[in-house]
A protein has these predicted regions:
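Mature extracytoplasmic or otherwise solvent-exposed domains
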Residues: 1-96
Length: 96
């Protein structure tokens, strides 16, 4: 989500099951260079031990002008089985 100027907000979350033993989320900011998407930076978060079924990540980041998206990997482990989900955000263009 563009915030104005050259700042963006990246928010990702994962909600698992009540008996989940862990939830994790990775968010990778990607910039479009020509016809390719190039990884810029990756952030990771893991659920706290007191609340294993939920993880949130809210990041504010300054970027140069360009076209961006976020690729996120969400995982939840329950009863020894880990499920994964992969998502792309909308594409945003930052220009001053």
């Amino acid at each position: 989500i563009p915030l104005g100027g050259s700042s963006i907000e990246i928010y990702v979350s994962t909600i698992g099951y009540p008996n989940a033993t862990s939830c994790t989320v990775d968010a990778t900011l990607q910039r479009k260079i020509g016809s390719s998407w190039v990884d810029c930076k990756t952030w990771s978060a893991t659920s706290p031990s007191s609340h294993r079924e939920l993880v949130d990540m809210d990041i504010y980041y300054t970027v140069p002008n360009g076209t961006y998206r976020v690729f996120s990997t969400h995982s939840v482990t329950d009863s020894g089985i880990t499920e994964y989900e992969y998502m792309f955000s909308d594409v945003v263009t930052i220009s001053s």
